[in-house]
Curated annotation (Swiss-Prot):
Gene3D superfamilies: Vaccinia Virus protein VP39 (3.40.50.150). It is found in: Cytoplasm. Pfam families: GidB (PF02527). Specifically methylates the N7 position of guanine in position 518 of 16S rRNA. The keyword Coiled coil does not apply. The lineage of its organism: Bacteria, Bacillati, Actinomycetota, Actinomycetes, Kineosporiales. Its EC number is 2.1.1.-. This is Ribosomal RNA small subunit methyltransferase G. GO terms for molecular function: rRNA (guanine-N7-)-methyltransferase activity. One of its GO terms (cellular component) is cytosol. Belongs to the methyltransferase superfamily. RNA methyltransferase RsmG family. It is an enzyme of class 2 (transferase). Keywords: Cytoplasm, Methyltransferase, rRNA processing, S-adenosyl-L-methionine, Transferase.
Length: 254
């Protein structure tokens, strides 16, 4: 990913939308989206208009929606098996779930998003794009949909650091499936910081760091974690500083 961290930028006022012309990377769009390239263009337009107006996408992202968002997210398909079921956790305005669905008609995708404004946009977008047979939308936090939905792959971009994401996403992955998180340049640092969490959850396979997409700045770095076949345990959250000194029944009100 061009800026390396997988995190969308802050959302300034729509009044500062830049007017610069958008360059369409025609060959890449045709290669990645095939006969759905026109629908990808419609989605880009939705992000550039309603997405910006509703504060879901920063106006400065508009000139780079193709490279940094649609293509970048669609390349995730390179590490997802044919015919997989997918949950896109914290989908926001549909990233990476919608580009992935457009590029990979073989995948069945559920977008999970807690915020109402984003959830409404997602429902409108999948209707407008004719994706209702392939893409479902659920409103909720990862913790709320646990036990209700699961999939062979859970994707996430810019939702939380791995240390937190493991606890949110892995319980939604069926045994033998994977968490696939777009992480950009922070991948190795986040893996190191979250190693103990993974161990506590009983996940034994080492996370893989994979490059997807071409080496021209539109590709990105992905962390793939195998859920394994054993039971998943809850990770123990570290005690807040000073917690051990508190006496039971005194000053413990939340
Ligand atoms: C920075 S946005 C990223 C959106 C999108 N994935 C993208 O890359 O553009 C983070 C998203 O995660 C969602 N989110 C935050 N906490 C969550 C949770 N516990 N479970 C599911 N989604 C969550 C937010 O509502 C928000 O849409």
């Amino acid at each position: 990913m061009p800026e390396g961290d997988g995190v969308p930028r802050e959302t300034p006022s729509p009044s500062v939308v830049p007017e610069s012309p958008v360059e369409v990377p025609v060959e890449a769009v045709a290669r990645v989206f095939g006969d759905r390239a026109d629908r990808a263009a419609t989605y880009r337009e939705l992000l550039a208009t309603a997405g910006v107006e509703r504060g879901l996408i920063g106006p400065r992202e508009v000139p780079r929606l193709w490279d940094r968002h649609l293509l970048n997210c669609a390349y995730l398909g390179e590490v997802i098996d044919q015919g997989s079921s997918v949950i896109d956790l914290g989908s926001g305005a549909g990233l990476p779930g919608i580009p992935l669905a457009l590029a990979r008609p073989d995948l069945q995708i559920r977008l999970v998003e807690p915020l109402e404004r984003r959830y409404t946009f997602l429902r409108e977008a999948i209707t407008e794009l004719g994706l209702r047979d392939q893409v479902a939308v659920a409103r909720g936090r990862a913790e709320d949909v646990r036990g209700e939905f699961s999939a062979s792959v859970v994707t996430a971009r810019a939702v939380a650091p791995l240390k937190t994401l493991y606890g949110w996403a892995l319980p939604l992955v069926v045994t033998g499936g994977h968490l696939v998180a777009i992480k950009g340049r922070s991948a190795s640092d986040e893996i190191a910081a979250a190693g103990e969490t993974l161990r506590q959850m009983g996940v034994t396979a080492a996370p893989e760091v994979l490059s997807v997409g071409p080496d021209d700045g539109t590709g990105t770095t992905v962390v793939r974690v195998a859920r394994g076949h054993g039971p998943l345990r809850a990770a123990t959250a570290p005690a807040p500083p000073g917690a051990a000194k508190r006496r039971p029944g005194k000053g413990n009100r939340r």
